[in-house]
Amino acid sequence: MIPGELLIDDGEHELNAGRATVTVVVSNTGDRPVQIGSHYHFYEVNDALAFDRAAARGFRLNIAAGTAVRFEPGQERTVELVELAGDRIVYGFNGKVMGKL
């Protein structure tokens, strides 16, 4: 095995199996594009994005790791979020949580 090498079984792999998801409609009300990465706590994204923030608390985009979603000015789109796993302790981002969810 080479350091960092991944040995993955053949076939389909379901990401985030068994985790709660929520779907929200997001609108970019700003005048600049906003890009959100796969593991960013969605509740704390740029304030120019209008959506049900309470529903997004403790969730991130349900997309592959290392990818992102871009919201152009005036654009509205529906995204699926998946609950954060692990200890569910959030620090940093925009400082809106700074502790346990």
Swiss-Prot record:
An annotated GO cellular component: urease complex
Pathway: Nitrogen metabolism; urea degradation; CO(2) and NH(3) from urea (urease route): step 1/1
Single Gene Ontology BP annotation: urea catabolic process
Catalytic activity: urea + 2 H2O + H(+) = hydrogencarbonate + 2 NH4(+)
Subcellular location: Cytoplasm
Organism classification: Bacteria, Pseudomonadati, Pseudomonadota, Betaproteobacteria, Burkholderiales
SUPFAM superfamilies on file: Urease, beta-subunit
An example molecular function term from Gene Ontology annotations: urease activity
EC assignment: 3.5.1.5
Organism from which the protein derives: Paraburkholderia xenovorans (strain LB400)
Protein name: Urease subunit beta
Listed InterPro entries: Urease_beta-like, Urease_betasu_sf, Urease_subunit
